[in-house]
């Protein structure tokens, strides 16, 4: 897991190059994969229907294939999330970004939330070294709920907590990233996503404690980083 200083020195290696818009075409997905190959991003984060395509394009690289589960509302049943996650892994995904059940969290149904995360984690990790990131959708949560979601995610065996889907009314904030890092500690992943459009945005999130960045502006971020003489 990259430390803060290492992240700023290798910024491409901690970006999930993302294209999740509903009208993304196959050609646009191919372009994202080509960019990921060229820049050496940590992963491409794409919708489940494109996992097999991304896998074929990137299987001879170090770029991981990341996809989303229960996206973007988190309101699917546990069983549906498990099936969706396992199918994605079988098609070549090695990172799963799952949206927790926001409604259940806000209803205080913490055992349910822990169970759903745990079931997905157990199912995908039985197929190999799969990274599970739990999307909290922080814009809908109080600080107390953010803290509880982080604690539950860690207890349930996930590898990362992630701020946002990018489809809610708000994205990543420095304050939320700092809070999430404080709760999960050093040896756990924090992914900032939603509204990160520049190197300065990414740098602020890294300095706040993020060690993965989700962004559709990955190329722009790296090019700005290079212009500052850092790459």
Swiss-Prot record:
Its EC number is 4.1.2.4. Keywords: Cytoplasm, Lyase, Schiff base. GO terms for biological process: 2-deoxyribose 1-phosphate catabolic process; carbohydrate catabolic process; deoxyribonucleotide catabolic process. The keyword Zinc does not apply. GO terms for molecular function: deoxyribose-phosphate aldolase activity. It holds the Pfam family DeoC. It is found in: Cytoplasm. Its main location: cytoplasm. One of its GO terms (cellular component) is cytoplasm. Gene3D superfamilies: Aldolase class I. The active site is at residues 97, 162, 191. Catalyzes a reversible aldol reaction between acetaldehyde and D-glyceraldehyde 3-phosphate to generate 2-deoxy-D-ribose 5-phosphate. HAMAP family: DeoC_type1 (MF_00114). This is Deoxyribose-phosphate aldolase. It comes from Caldanaerobacter subterraneus subsp. tengcongensis (strain DSM 15242 / JCM 11007 / NBRC 100824 / MB4). The lineage of its organism: Bacteria, Bacillati, Bacillota, Clostridia, Thermoanaerobacterales.
């Amino acid at each position: 897991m990259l430390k803060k200083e290492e992240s700023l020195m290798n910024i491409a290696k901690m970006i999930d190059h993302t294209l999740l818009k509903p009208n993304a075409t196959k050609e646009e997905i191919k372009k994202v994969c080509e960019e990921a190959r060229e820049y050496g991003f940590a992963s491409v984060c794409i919708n489940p229907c494109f996992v097999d395509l991304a896998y074929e394009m990137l299987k001879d690289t170090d770029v991981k294939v990341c996809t989303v589960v229960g996206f973007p509302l988190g309101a699917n049943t546990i069983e549906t999330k498990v099936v969706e996650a396992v199918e994605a892994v079988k098609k070549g995904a090695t990172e799963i970004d799952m949206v927790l059940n926001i409604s259940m969290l806000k209803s205080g149904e913490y055992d349910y939330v822990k169970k759903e995360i745990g079931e997905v984690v157990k199912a995908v990790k039985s197929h190999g070294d799969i990274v599970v990131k739990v999307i909290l959708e922080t814009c809908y949560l109080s600080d107390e709920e953010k803290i509880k979601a982080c604690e539950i995610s860690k207890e349930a065996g996930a590898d990362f907590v992630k701020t946002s889907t990018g489809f809610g009314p708000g994205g990543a904030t420095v304050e939320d990233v700092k809070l999430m890092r404080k709760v999960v500690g050093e040896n756990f992943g924090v992914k900032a996503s939603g509204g990160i459009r520049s190197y300065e945005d990414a740098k602020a999130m890294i300095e706040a404690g993020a060690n993965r960045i989700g962004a559709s502006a990955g190329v722009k971020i790296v090019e700005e980083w290079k212009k500052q003489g850092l790459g």
